Amino acid sequence: MKNVYGNALTLTLFGESHGSSIGAVLDGLSPGIPVDEAHIARELTRRRPQGQTATARVEQDPFVIESGVFNGCTTGTPLCIRIPNAGQHSGDYAGMQDCARPGHSDYPAFCKYHGYSDYRGGGHFSGRITAALVAAGAIAEGALRGRGIRIGTHLAACAGVQDRPFRQTDGQIPDGELDALREPGFPVLDRAAGERMQQASLAAKADGGSVGGVTE
């Protein structure tokens, strides 16, 4: 039943979509790692739904670092970051506790927690929990940057449309490739492919359906 991930560095997720808050606890961070709260805020802004292909639930995601940081650096003790919830519409889910939605985690959550889980908005398995993942990832990303390591992901395929692969020089991906992914819109290397992905997604949405994707 645990919600703890990792070994040397562990991540614990807490909260539900329609609870008071969500958040994450990182344990195993070395002391003295700079924590850039402005960078965390920027990453949460990037995660925030944008455009017609995103969820209608939009929150500002103010966060509070409850522990593990002092004078702008990690202390080495567990770092807890909490994000209050504000945009819930629990009435939309009235009567749905006995009706599992296709493509959602409702049924697996029911089986795992024997019917006691908070089903509203997907509960602990809502897309809302990705805000906590992004916040924790921004902190871990800062630790990796100090070692010369960068992280980047692009939407390699969506709705049958392929993005081009990363360009590499001597086994390294140039910074420009990763920087391009931070531009507004779909995180793709080929903007024309991104436009086709978006159009295919909107067409599926208009038809009451959805599309899948592959990241790299």
Where are the regions a protein language model picked out?
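Generic N-terminal targeting/processing segments that precede catalytic cores or assembly contacts
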Residues: 1-130, 134-216
